[in-house]
Regions:
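Mature, function-bearing regions of proteins
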Residues: 2-238
Length: 238
């Protein structure tokens, strides 16, 4: 089981309660833990929005500068689900908003439900700092965990090899997501996201989103890469 993630088990195909009010704002702790070939970890704060992807909020005034979620920042979720034979009438998206026009989303999560409120899929959309993205379509096991082969270069210090074990707990008053990279005999990398829902007011939104902006977090992540390089970790070819 990935570390630091706990949620109620949702067996595949069970009916879930879909009374969650969106949009919802979460303040989250994000941690990266590297276990091989050397130990290294860091943590940062981030703000996330949970939105209905088919009814994206249209912020006005000041909130347009720091609370906008755009569909073209993400994959064509409807086409992707269709390609996998998945029917979903409601899609909830957990993602970071644009701040002053800039968006940085290392991971966004889609929870996909049918008309009866049955969870049909979870999609993890991963972005790297090189402008690439890849979607991992999961059909979670009981407990909300799914697996997928790693297909995209993310960290310059991790080769494109291994299996992601992804656990995405259905959001409520809190939200929890973990991604564990597994290879035979080891789990060299784990990332976790734990968020708490905050009041959806203009003041709370501006304060939270500006304080934990994507640009700041991108610089922090890249600085951690410099630290790893200085410690002698070898860059893997793309």
């Amino acid at each position: 089981m990935p570390i630091g993630c706990s949620c109620r088990g949702i067996p595949w195909g069970d009916v879930v309660t879909m009374d969650l009010v969106v949009p919802a704002l979460y303040e989250a702790d994000v941690t990266h833990v590297r276990r091989s070939p050397l130990d290294h970890s860091f943590r940062y704060r981030a703000s996330y929005w949970l939105v209905d992807f088919d009814r994206l909020p249209q912020p006005r005034g000041l909130t347009r500068l720091c609370g906008r979620v755009r569909s073209d920042d993400h994959l064509d979720i409807r086409s992707l689900l269709s390609d996998h034979g998945i029917e979903a009438t409601r899609v909830l998206l957990l993602t970071s908003s644009r701040v002053l026009g800039y968006a940085f989303n290392p991971i966004s999560v889609f929870w996909c439900y049918d008309e009866a409120g049955t969870q049909r899929a979870v999609v993890a959309e991963v972005h790297n700092t090189y402008g690439d993205r890849h979607a991992y379509v999961l059909r979670p096991e009981p407990g909300g965990t799914g697996t997928a082969e790693k297909r995209m270069y993310v960290s310059p210090f991790n080769r494109v090899e291994g299996t992601y074990r992804i656990r995405a707990c259905e959001p409520a008053a809190s939200v929890s997501v973990s991604v564990t990279l597994e290879r035979p005999g080891e789990a060299p990398f784990v990332a976790t996201l734990h968020g708490t829902r905050r009041p959806n007011t203009t003041a709370a939104m501006v304060r939270s989103v500006v304080r934990h902006s994507g640009l700041r977090n991108r610089v922090l992540i890249q600085w951690q890469g410099v630290r790893l390089w200085r410690r002698g970790l070898r860059v893997q070819p793309r």
